[in-house]
Every structure is written in C-alpha cells, then in structure tokens.
C-alpha cells in the first residue's frame, strides 16, 4: 500500500517503512505525527483511491526520528568594480520521519 501526502507544501509518495526528510514539523523526537492531507491511496489489490482534493478518512502515521538542519547553502552577492561583497549562509531545518501505518 502506498499514499501521496502533502506536508510543508510538498508532495511525497510514501509506503510503510519509508524514511523521509520533510520540512520542519513541530514535534518532539520519538513522538508520532499524523499526516491527514492524503491526495491518493494505492491499495495492494491494485485499487487506487484519488481524493477530490483529499481522500476522506485517510491518515498516514509517522514516527519522528530526528530534527536537524541541512547542509549550508552560501549566497554570495557582489557588484563588480564597486567593492560591494555580501556573503550569507542558510541552513534549512528538516524533520526525519519514518512511515509507520497508512489508514485508508
């Protein structure tokens, strides 16, 4: 069984046991989160349920494995011949989750 869920403005195709890096969720490590924005559910018998826009009554339960930050992205701006240089870094926060159960 698989599902397509929306979290953090992005869509992910997930199955039970998958490990994902998603945009930061406000949850503690080793807690469970429910993702209820399910767009599509594919069952083992080949049946596919498509939501309009969400599948009613469908939930995906996931366990939070870690909270962290991605690698640093360096933004460097400059203007030639004007002695203007600006260096800025950014590390995007993420949440590492493992899909435990898909309820449809």
UniProtKB/Swiss-Prot annotation:
A Gene Ontology biological process term: translation
GO molecular function: rRNA binding; structural constituent of ribosome
Keyword Ribonucleoprotein: yes
Cellular component GO terms held in the UniProt record: cytoplasm; ribonucleoprotein complex; ribosome
The UniProt record lists the keyword Transit peptide: no
Keywords for the protein's UniProt record, in alphabetical order: Ribonucleoprotein, Ribosomal protein, RNA-binding, rRNA-binding
Similarity comment: family membership: Belongs to the bacterial ribosomal protein bL21 family.
Function: This protein binds to 23S rRNA in the presence of protein L20.
HAMAP family per UniProt: Ribosomal_bL21
Assembly description: Part of the 50S ribosomal subunit. Contacts protein L20.
Protein's name in the database: Large ribosomal subunit protein bL21
Primary gene name: rplU
């Amino acid at each position: 069984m698989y599902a397509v869920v929306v979290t953090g403005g992005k869509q992910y195709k997930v199955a039970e046991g998958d490990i994902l890096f998603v945009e930061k969720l406000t949850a503690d490590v080793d807690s469970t989160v429910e993702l209820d924005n399910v767009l599509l559910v594919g069952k083992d018998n080949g049946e596919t349920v498509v939501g309009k826009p969400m599948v009613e009554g469908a939930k995906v339960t996931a366990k939070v494995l870690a909270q962290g930050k991605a690698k640093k992205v360096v933004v460097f701006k400059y203007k030639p011949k004007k002695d203007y240089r600006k260096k800025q870094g950014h590390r995007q926060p993420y949440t590492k989750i493992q899909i435990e159960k898909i309820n449809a």
